[in-house]
A protein has these predicted regions:
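Aromatic-lined carbohydrate-recognition surfaces of secreted/lumenal glycan-active proteins
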Residues: 288, 324-346, 394-403
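N-terminal secretory signal peptides
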Residues: 1-16, 25-34
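Substrate-binding cleft of secreted/luminal carbohydrate-active enzymes
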Residues: 394-469
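N-terminal module-boundary/linker segments of secreted carbohydrate-active enzymes
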Residues: 46-133, 137, 147-155
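Alpha-helical scaffolding within the catalytic cores
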Residues: 113-121, 271-273, 340-353, 378-385, ...
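Aromatic- and acid-rich polysaccharide-binding/catalytic face
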Residues: 349-372, 424
Length: 469
């Protein structure tokens, strides 16, 4: 989820993201106990399955690079399940639209370059994250989708030279930079140097990472409701969508031939055009759409969190078949990530699982507690890690305000050996002491990014040619 994107207004914490839900031990007490809160939302679960080892079982045309990335994740998962944990990739989400346009966002007032929170771990620790997640949504209060400078992949469909859409160009340039390096030699791609002068005379400077492959790339999609006249965070919420008053709206969205369905496909085409550019340069993307579908935040949940399970899985399948089938995108690794099912933020998510044929990685967005006051005092985040085991997929902590290791939690990843742990945006500085960030990045089993990826690290270049084992 995202922070508010109102120009000139602060985005604080995950006030940053979730403003309506209680956090921590006080909320647990209000429900009469953590486990009781979970049990109140019991749903059905599929039987345990063996660990998926290769993308070909889901997509026979998966790119070699995407298969290599998946083998890395599956290998880390297999080792963890066997009791010989090799390491955890440390990730960072960057809210590029807020970095670029909201002067109150982040750890100081004033403008920030795109990718500010990609570089911030390096400013603190000397090391880059191994994974950068980005987002083409939700827009910054603009009418219709758009882009900054016109490019081959966007000029035919999307209005160009829109100042408050320039961040979408930054998003793909950052993704290219993490996978291929920044700055890099001219390879026919856009902005290989990381420095670009725009039509309005302003200059964009992206963070350098050594000029060589430096990590993995992900994409979430905070999609405003299909057909929304304004693209903004507010329009991603259930209270703003037609479904708040019209229970039949979502069925029309899912029905080919309807105006609502056409609006959905328009949104997905915006996503696909940008992902297609990355596919053309062989950039694998961990795509995490329609997350936190099990939220119990009511009207302040995302519009897709108000759906019945069968509607949600139909929406997921529609997106999948459009991106992979209609658009031929075989660089994608699909991530399904409910919110923590603590009975406060979310209910048990099992009925919302689209199925192994549509999902490669499972994860959780965990805002259920803090390192000082965890949901499960015995082992922070372990409840969610155990709950996802039977899907037979690599398990990731997809969103957290907090780094996994620090003064309050020194053994998190031994007890819950996630293969990837991603910190959300400015939560890195708002919710973590520098010493805790340093401890996480310095841990011998933390996999970081850049040319040097730590003792448990990865040779990023080996992922590119499909030879990684």
């Amino acid at each position: 989820m995202l922070g508010r994107d109102v120009p000139g207004r602060p985005v604080l914490g995950r006030e940053l993201k979730r403003r309506n839900l209680l956090l921590g031990a006080a909320a647990t007490a209000a429900t009469g106990g953590a486990l009781a809160g979970v049990a109140a939302f019991s749903t059905s679960r599929a039987p345990a399955t063996a660990l998926q080892k290769d993308l070909l079982s889901r997509d026979p045309k998966a790119s070699k690079a995407a298969r290599s990335v998946y083998r890395l994740l599956a290998g880390l998962e297999a080792d963890a399940r066997a009791g010989r944990r090799r390491g955890t990739l440390v990730g960072q989400h960057a809210e590029v639209h807020n970095e670029r346009y909201n002067p109150e966002y982040g750890d100081h007032t004033g403008p920030k370059p795109p990718g500010y929170y990609y570089r911030k771990p390096q400013d603190i620790t000397g090391k880059l994250p191994a994974f950068l997640e980005l987002d083409l949504g939700p827009g910054y209060q603009q009418e219709s989708w758009g882009v900054g400078e016109a490019r081959d992949y966007s000029r035919a469909a999307w209005p160009a030279r829109r100042e408050f859409w320039t961040y979408t160009n930054d998003v793909v340039d950052l993704a290219m930079g993490v996978w291929h390096g920044l700055p890099r030699k001219d390879d026919g791609s856009y902005n290989p140097t990381g420095t670009e002068t725009l039509w309005n005379g302003t200059k964009t400077v992206l963070p350098a990472n050594g000029g060589a492959p430096a990590g993995l790339v992900g994409m979430s999609f905070h999609q405003p409701w299909p057909g929304s006249p304004v693209k903004s965070y507010e329009q991603t919420l259930r209270r703003s969508a037609p479904s708040a008053k019209d229970p039949g709206w979502i069925d029309r969205v899912l029905t080919p031939g309807s105006a609502e369905h056409a609006a959905l496909l328009l949104d997905l085409s915006f996503l696909a055009d940008h992902l297609g550019y990355l596919a053309a340069y062989d950039v694998p993307v961990l795509l995490r759409p329609y997350h936190e579908m099990n939220s119990i935040g009511g009207e302040q949940s995302f519009w897709w969190a108000g759906l019945k399970p069968q509607q949600y899985t139909a929406l997921w399948e529609l997106l999948y078949h459009y991106l992979v089938g209609s658009r031929g995108l075989h660089n994608l690794i699909f991530v399904w990530a409910p919110t923590a099912w603590d009975g406060i933020h979310g209910r048990e998510p099992w009925d919302f699982y689209p199925g192994g044929e549509y999902v490669d990685v499972v994860g959780v967005d965990d805002y259920s507690g803090t390192p000082d006051n965890p949901f499960d005092p015995a082992a922070w985040t372990s409840t969610w890690h155990r709950g996802l085991e039977d899907y037979g997929k690599p398990r990731i902590l997809a969103e957290s305000f907090h780094v996994p290791l620090g003064a309050a939690q020194r053994t998190t990843l031994d007890k819950a050996p996630w293969v990837l742990w991603t910190v959300w945006g400015d939560g890195l500085t708002a919710k973590n002491a520098d010493a805790d960030v340093q401890q996480t990045y310095d841990d011998p089993k933390t996999i970081t990014g850049g040319r040097e990826s730590g003792p448990a690290g990865v040779q990023w270049l080996a992922l590119h040619d499909g030879t990684f084992e």
